[in-house]
Amino acid sequence: MRINHIDLNGFRNYDFETADFSPGTNVIYGENAQGKTNLLESVYMLAMGRSFRTRFDKEFIGFGCDSAEILADVVSHGREQTVRILLRSGVRKQITVNSVKKTASELGETLNVVLFCPDDLNLIKEGAAARRRLMDNAISQIRPRYAEYLSQFNKFYESKTRILKDWREKPSLLDTLDEFSDGMCRSSAQLIRYRASFAARLADEAAPIHSEFSGADEKLGIEYSTVSAVKDPTASAKEIFYDLCDHMEAHRRAELDSGQCLSGAHKDDLIISINGKNARSFASQGQTRTAALSIKLAEREIYLDETGEYPILLLDDVLSELDTKRQEFVLNRIGGGQTLITCCEDEGISRRTGGKVLHVANGRIG
């Protein structure tokens, strides 16, 4: 799985720019604010249909441009394919694969990416939302139905939250509360099943990677956490649904009093431990960074197991945040697939990986 060629027209600070990539490692270097991350963002969008930096499509359209276009020649599942994303202000984005219209959730059938940026180094110490986002981004690429369930859940959650906040001023809103509670339980049940399965696989893949780096003295653990009333997160969606309904009904008064949704998949988390101790509370910065690296590299292995191909790995200015030992650990494990690395200086990365070098300056790629 790889991108051979990309055209960027009116995208961010790229007017009309093209780039050819090596099937292995590609080192993209240049000073800050020149467009390196914009280039990685365009590749991310080809797989996800959205950005990892903004929710607003209008921000992709370059100054003075009416539209932005990303056009790429990719090789996936043994086939050459063309992926195109067209963005216009005020108009829904257009996505096509080989000129056939696609939804954002369908892009994962053609292209997969794993993004690793400096914020991910804090994955262990951040709140649960960061770890849910990790699960959501990964699962939605290999299980398109998951993205549909996630979209449904978010709509039910937002609607119910508004009711819980405003019902005192508009008591009639409570007439629809049960409808949204039911929808939350149904979509949550599906998300919980997918997440529990993914978390188990992530734990199996990450532990040996972590052990390889840290030695046998440290054991990485990953456990999935969800609503306490869910007896078995790997059970059928129907069983989980009933557990959630019971929990939600028991907390109905508390939800009305607090104005918050107290039951559902938005309560999920991944509990990361090192030698049995909660890493968020007790691990050092070095330990949490090693754990985060192991988790991201494990995510890559899961894609390989699922699709038979490595996803495209995007390392956005992350190597500069790592010491030499951790840099080598990452670089030694990225073989077998295509990798795009951004950095301010090449610093011998291309020599150590045998990769292609691209220089970015003022929105030009050379």
Model-predicted regions and their roles:
Residues 11, 15-96, 145, 153, ...:
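Conserved P-loop NTP-binding catalytic core
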Residues 137, 347-360:
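Short regulatory helix/loop adjacent to the ATP-binding pocket of P-loop NTPases
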Residues 113-115, 339, 357-359:
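Conserved beta-strand scaffold positions in the cores of enzyme catalytic domains, especially
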Residues 316-318:
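Walker B catalytic acidic pair
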Residues 122-124, 129-178, 182-185:
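Long, charged N-terminal accessory/stalk domains
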Residues 47-130, 134-146, 203-208, 240, ...:
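Nucleotide-state sensing region of NTPase/ATPase domains
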Residues 1-31, 171-312, 321-325, 329-332, ...:
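Conserved NTPase motor "head" modules and their coupling/switch loops across ABC/AAA+ ATPases, GTPases
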Residues 72, 338-345:
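Structural recognition of the conserved hydrophobic beta-strand(s) that form the central parallel beta-sheet
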